[in-house]
A protein has these predicted regions:
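Residues in the helix-turn-helix
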Residues: 36, 47, 62
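DNA major-groove recognition helix of helix-turn-helix/homeodomain DNA-binding modules
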Residues: 59-76
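N-terminal flexible/basic segments that precede or flank functional cores
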Residues: 1-18, 81
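Short amphipathic helical patch at the helix-1/turn junction of helix-turn-helix
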Residues: 17, 28-29, 57
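Short basic helix-loop element that most often maps to the first helix and adjoining turn
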Residues: 21-36, 40, 65
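Recognition helix of helix-turn-helix/homeodomain-like DNA-binding domains
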Residues: 42-56
């Protein structure tokens, strides 16, 4: 049986999901497919999919790459992401 997540782990999971949603929304507004954005960022399309679905903990390096590639300023910690 899987252990219950602590409040902090739940919050991290929630932020990951919200940030992934925001990245997907911005990507779609900019007219990029996951494949096109992956090529622009020089990463795998599957990595973008995992990030957008909250399955991958994004690093600051990736956040900067998304920001530059999508011409969008992401807020690192914002409860209203």
């Amino acid at each position: 049986m899987k252990a219950e997540l602590s409040a902090t782990e739940e919050q991290i999971k929630d932020y990951r999901l919200k940030l992934g949603d925001k990245i997907r929304i911005v990507r779609e507004k900019r007219g990029y497919s996951q494949e096109q954005l992956a090529e622009k960022m020089d990463i795998n399309r599957s990595t973008i999919s995992k990030i957008e679905n909250g399955k991958f903990s994004i690093t600051v390096d990736y956040l900067v790459r998304f920001s530059i590639s999508l011409d969008y300023e992401f807020k690192v910690i914002d409860k209203n992401i």
